[in-house]
From Swiss-Prot:
It is a multi-pass membrane protein. The chain crosses the membrane at residues 3-23, 34-54, 61-81. It comes from Alkaliphilus oremlandii (strain OhILAs) (Clostridium oremlandii (strain OhILAs)). NCBIfam families: PRK04164.1-2, PRK04164.1-5. The keyword Membrane applies. The keyword Phosphoprotein does not apply. It is found in: Cell membrane. InterPro entries: DUF2179, DUF5698, N-reg_PII/ATP_PRibTrfase_C, UPF0316. It comes from the Bacteria. This is UPF0316 protein Clos_0555. Pfam families: DUF2179, DUF5698.
Amino acid sequence: MEALLGYLLIFVARLTDVSMATIRMIMVVKGKRVIAACIGFVEVSIYVVAIGKVLSGMDNPLNVLAYASGFATGNYVGIFLEEKMALGNIIAQVISDYEVEKLVEKLRNVGFGVTVIEGYGREGIRYILNVSLQRKHLSRLYQTVEEHDKKAFVTVTDARAIRGGYFAGMKK
């Protein structure tokens, strides 16, 4: 029973510290220094406990298996958590040629700020709709665009910072 608890401790510690590492890296990229440092402190403390447990029992391959399994699962869980947290801002480009004025009106009625640029694609004139938004509202953008134009081309890029312009909250 004690050995089983040891494996579980190693697994959970690795799962936790690797998940935290994923979130910490996102905070670093977004310029959130203090949050990243605090997460890093807790993360490395947990890591030291896990590696200490493994190194004290290197003759037991199940310790290594628990460590590796926790690492792999931690990567998965970290990415899952990051997606659910949906931190930060993004810039979406919606390219369409179908009743663009109506699409722009729908997007603005939902609460998005939209800038329209005329472009020329392979098959003629297209309109590029630039939309800056919080990541947590991306599914609402997709839904609104999909309801209007199933063939619209949408690209999304991360925005480290947004300053000025129309950046309102979503309407219910």
